[in-house]
């Protein structure tokens, strides 16, 4: 039935379902996606999640997945949810999806965006699901070398910062840095926020760096720390052990401009 081109399969964010079922050798032929229908109709007006669409257009608040599996470290996987609760959740999911489809399908024609949906948005589903399953090849050894290089440069900067400060402290602590800059060294321009700690944001350090070496070196240290923690270290954690690749998720119904977004991890903001 799923692979019968005469049978239309309707989903909400159906790219996710395509990826899951592909692991079991199942494929959809004819598809519609209520999330992308909403995006074609109302892009930039509101979010296009099932909860948002259900509440806005059906006046119904769906059962939250968090209420079933929990959150954080105490969260369970869906296979541990009692079968009656899981069944009700799945049935509601399917019911909301088909009701949204019946609402959006004629609106596409009335709003004259059927062509946008059928020729731009919907065809992307299969392309992006294939891309996500294939993944992005990443050289772990290169990331490790870069992380080690960043660590060495940070350590060297820390020694220079300690020398200028006259003592060791946690360079990554805004509170300790503020005390060094404004209390111990007496730099001008110190301003405390609501927490009582000095502000040591990028703009503050940039102003101080025009006169002093220590703030300039802290700026360099922060840049290296950001590169290491956010990119070279974090990307290693996202490498799938089975494929050796990073499998991001491409978001179609995200940016108001129509451009793709990337999440978990975001591969579109990695510096060259």
Residue map of PLM features:
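Conserved "right-hand" nucleotidyltransferase catalytic core of DNA-directed polymerases
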Residues: 14, 29, 45, 53, ...
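Alpha-helical scaffold elements adjacent to nucleotide-binding pockets in ATP/GTP-utilizing enzyme cores
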Residues: 17-20, 49-53
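Phosphate- and divalent-cation-binding pockets in alpha/beta enzyme and binding domains
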Residues: 16-23, 180
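Acidic beta-strand-to-loop metal/phosphate-binding motif
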Residues: 6-14
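Catalytic-core regions built around general acid/base machinery
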Residues: 1-4
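Hydrophobic side chains within alpha-helical segments
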Residues: 20, 36, 96-98
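Conserved beta-strand -> loop -> alpha-helix junction used to position metal-binding or nucleic-acid-contacting
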Residues: 27-43, 50-52
């Amino acid at each position: 039935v799923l692979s019968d081109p005469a049978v239309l399969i309707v989903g909400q964010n159906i790219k996710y379902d395509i990826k899951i079922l592909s692991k079991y050798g199942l494929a959809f032929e004819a598809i519609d996606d209520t999330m992308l229908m909403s995006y074609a109709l109302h892009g930039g007006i509101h979010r296009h999640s099932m909860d948002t669409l259900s509440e806005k257009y059906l006046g119904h608040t769906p059962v939250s997945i968090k209420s079933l599996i929990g959150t954080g470290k105490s969260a369970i996987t869906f296979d541990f949810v009692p079968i009656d609760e899981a069944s009700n959740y799945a049935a509601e999911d399917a019911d909301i999806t088909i009701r949204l489809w019946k609402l959006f399908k004629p609106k596409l024609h009335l709003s004259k965006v059927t062509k946008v949906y059928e020729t731009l948005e919907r065809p992307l589903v299969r392309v992006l699901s294939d891309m996500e399953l294939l993944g992005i090849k990443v050289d772990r050894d290169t990331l490790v070398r870069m992380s080690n290089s960043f660590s060495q440069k940070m350590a060297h900067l820390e020694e220079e910062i300690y020398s200028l400060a006259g003592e060791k402290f946690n360079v990554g602590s805004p509170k300790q840095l503020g005390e060094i800059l404004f209390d111990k060294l007496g730099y001008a321009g110190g301003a405390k926020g609501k927490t009582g700690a000095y502000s040591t944001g990028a703009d503050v350090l940039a102003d101080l760096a025009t006169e002093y070496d220590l703030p300039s070196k802290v700026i360099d240290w922060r840049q290296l720390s950001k590169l290491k923690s956010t990119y070279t270290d974090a990307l290693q954690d996202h490498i799938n052990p089975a494929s050796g690749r990073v499998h991001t998720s491409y978001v179609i119904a995200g940016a108001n401009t129509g451009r793709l977004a990337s999440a978990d991890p975001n591969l579109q903001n990695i510096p060259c």
